[in-house]
């Protein structure tokens, strides 16, 4: 199937997998996968692909309202907002969404409001601590999927260890956006994964060594892996015999120590 494991977080250690790596229970796995095979990949990990019908959002600001507006036609949504005036304002803007005025870190309140019956919980208040604590409350109440907005970069490494399924960071997105403009000419995009010693770099192939041989023969460093190749608007998960063409966009997952070796292949 068109899928590839590109990074593993094992006991706070980052691994770039090779063909002989084995996954063990508790690994946090990052993979590139064709959208049509996501369910199959999830099944391989031993997880269930949960259908989300009921979601609770903590925080009625712009982000919370945006999420609710975009998903209200697909699922039942509740918004929890601590500010009384804000709650009334949201109720007028989103008449078909149930608005609850209260403290999202109050376990008793959240249980009364049915958090334990939700398929997903999204915490997007303006306070990182509130988002983290409320997510822990959701995990305590056995909510299957949790997402938190966390802007303090120092908090990001601990988020996988406390059970968060996903973290969104506006500050990290801004840092990554800035990095795109200070990289070399052959780099189209740059990003990092919170809590992991790995960088994601999208290269534009020129006439370097990367284009002269199948990728299995170009001498790619052990701590780096090609996750995807975009050729003429067609995205593929490459194999060992894939031949990269000039102009292709190549997404590489690499440990920082291997970046220079990777860049030499594209020059």
Predicted segments, located by residue:
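Cytosolic regulatory regions of ion transport systems
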Residues: 1-267
């Amino acid at each position: 199937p068109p899928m590839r494991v590109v990074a593993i977080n094992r006991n706070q250690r980052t691994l770039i997998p090779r063909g002989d790596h084995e996954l063990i229970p508790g690994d946090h796995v990052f993979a590139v996968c064709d959208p049509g095979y996501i369910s199959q990949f999830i099944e391989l990990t031993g997880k269930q692909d949960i259908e989300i019908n009921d979601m609770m959002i903590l925080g009625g600001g712009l982000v919370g309202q945006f999420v609710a507006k975009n998903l209200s036609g697909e699922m039942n949504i509740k918004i929890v907002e601590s500010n009384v005036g804000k709650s009334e304002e949201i109720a007028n803007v989103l008449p078909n969404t149930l608005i609850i005025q209260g403290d999202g870190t109050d376990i008793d309140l959240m249980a009364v409001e049915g958090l334990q019956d939700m398929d997903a919980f999204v915490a997007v208040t303006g306070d990182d601590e509130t988002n983290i604590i409320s997510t822990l409350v959701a995990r305590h109440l056995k909510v299957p999927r949790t997402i938190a907005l966390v802007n303090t970069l120092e908090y990001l490494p601990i988020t996988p260890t406390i059970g968060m399924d996903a973290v969104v960071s506006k500050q990290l997105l801004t840092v990554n956006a800035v990095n795109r403009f200070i990289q070399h000419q052959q780099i189209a995009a740059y990003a990092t994964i919170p809590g992991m010693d790995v960088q994601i770099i999208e290269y534009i192939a020129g006439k370097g060594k990367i284009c002269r041989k199948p990728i299995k023969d170009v001498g790619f460093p052990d701590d780096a892996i090609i996750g995807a190749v975009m050729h003429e608007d067609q995205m593929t998960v490459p194999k060992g015999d894939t031949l990269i063409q000039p102009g292709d966009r190549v997404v590489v997952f690499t440990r920082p120590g291997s970046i220079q070796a990777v860049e030499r292949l594209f020059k």
